[in-house]
């Protein structure tokens, strides 16, 4: 079982009982975003039951991604790729990590990617950073598809994309569409293009043509209670 989660800080998650939840789950491979901690601290928190690789952000206290595998069930193969490409800037660091894993006894390995896209903010430099990042992600996604075709190693890209794909992925579409980052047509087009190119939206495939399921809710008001959420996390 592969589980992807935005930790909103691994130290804060640890204090809230993250490891107890993880140990009780069937997770074999844990894909993490917003780790927001140095590699040494993150590895120490995960403990001896998990092997892990990390791509921390070069800006202290921001971003950071990781992949952990449960010892005795899954192992890593080769060296991880902790960058998206050679154009990675400090603000883009800690947002892309590739590693190959293999379940005990499995014939075929799996490339797992932990991705954390910029949240953005409409009409600000934050949005400019997001829109500069998305085409580069798309270029790497195309390379991964080509590599699978050539070498037979499938890829699973997981993470917090900070973009919905359609009206089904956000409770309040009309008041947000083209008004807030994450619901802009210029962002949505990238996700739908990747699906057209051959990637599968696993959550949507499993859920079907329904509203939701959501993966993020605002802290404001009663968003969680009213299930007024967004689906911005993908596998």
Residue ranges of predicted features:
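Structured beta-strand-rich core segments of catalytic domains in phosphoester-bond hydrolases
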Residues: 35-36, 41-125
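Short catalytic/ligand-binding loop motif for oxyanion handling, primarily in non-cytosolic enzymes
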Residues: 11, 39-41, 61-62, 120-123, ...
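Metal-dependent phosphoesterases centered on the DNase I-like endonuclease/exonuclease/phosphatase
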Residues: 49-51, 133-234
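Short, acidic/polar
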Residues: 11-24
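Short amphipathic alpha-helices and their capping/turn segments at secondary-structure boundaries
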Residues: 20-23, 96-107, 136-153
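Mobile, glycine- and charge-enriched loop segments
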Residues: 1-13
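Active-site metal-binding loops of divalent metal-dependent hydrolases
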Residues: 7, 35, 161
